């Protein structure tokens, strides 16, 4: 698959799965734009990605930051071919393990503001660019709890379910512009963030919750996600692709 000449944006692209997606885009020939709330992380990540990488500071939860970013993209690039909505609210145990009746409105909205509203806003800005070129692919990183529910983490599940709905709306509203959209519902992925957040016992439990009895590897997940941006799936849109090692079927 070749993405030569394509420009791809990965929000939250300086670490974990986001960085691996950005690297996979670059390996396939794309020029990559990564974003992070922290300026200090951008250059280090671009060094890992390669020459065709540009870093922009962006806080998707802040409207002014989003508008400044969109203005910079319009100024420095003629088009955007691929948008990966990957930025997410950091995992917090004290919120994740709360039941619905114990979650405050502030805790709920902090997660929704980043995971859903931020992705919604940046998608709207990038759609304006894609519509002019009459082409583009938008991929939003969702999660299996958005489909199956979970014992914990209801704000996260709600936000990720919203991305699945957004994906369908993009497909219906913008298919006439040759703009395709996907959401990717991920299972448990072996990232540094996961290993920092969960105990060894919790990680073992996560492995046993899918049919393959292991965690997903960031590099294999990135390959699957990036393949959706190519021409092999040119008549596929509005779908949620489940990549979870068979978690939701057991």
Residue ranges and their predicted role:
Residues 81, 101-120, 135, 139, ...:
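Catalytic Tyr-X3-Lys loop
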Residues 226, 237-250:
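Short C-terminal tail/terminal secondary-structure segment
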């Amino acid at each position: 698959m070749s993405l030569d000449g394509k420009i791809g944006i990965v929000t939250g692209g300086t670490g974990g799965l986001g960085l691996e997606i950005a690297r996979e885009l670059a390996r396939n020939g794309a020029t990559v734009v990564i974003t992070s709330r922290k300026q200090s992380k951008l250059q280090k990540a671009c060094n890992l990605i390669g020459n065709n990488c540009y870093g922009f500071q962006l806080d998707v939860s802040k409207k002014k930051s989003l508008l400044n970013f969109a203005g910079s993209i319009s100024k420095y690039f003629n088009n955007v071919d691929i948008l990966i909505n990957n930025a997410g609210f950091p995992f917090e145990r004290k919120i994740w393990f709360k039941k619905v009746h114990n979650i405050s409105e502030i805790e709920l909205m902090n997660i929704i503001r980043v995971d859903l509203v931020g992705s919604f806003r940046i998608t709207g800005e990038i759609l304006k660019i894609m519509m002019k070129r009459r082409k583009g692919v938008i991929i939003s990183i969702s999660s299996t709890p958005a489909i199956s529910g979970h014992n914990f983490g209801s704000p996260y599940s709600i936000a990720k379910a919203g991305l699945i709905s957004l994906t369908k709306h993009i497909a219906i509203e913008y298919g006439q512009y040759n703009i395709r959209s996907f959401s990717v519902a991920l299972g448990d992925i072996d990232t540094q963030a996961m290993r920092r957040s969960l105990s060894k016992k919790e990680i073992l439990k996560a492995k046993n919750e899918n049919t393959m009895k292991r965690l997903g590897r960031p590099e294999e997940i990135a390959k699957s996600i990036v393949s959706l941006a190519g021409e092999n799936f040119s008549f596929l849109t509005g779908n949620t692709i489940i990549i979870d090692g068979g978690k939701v079927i057991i």
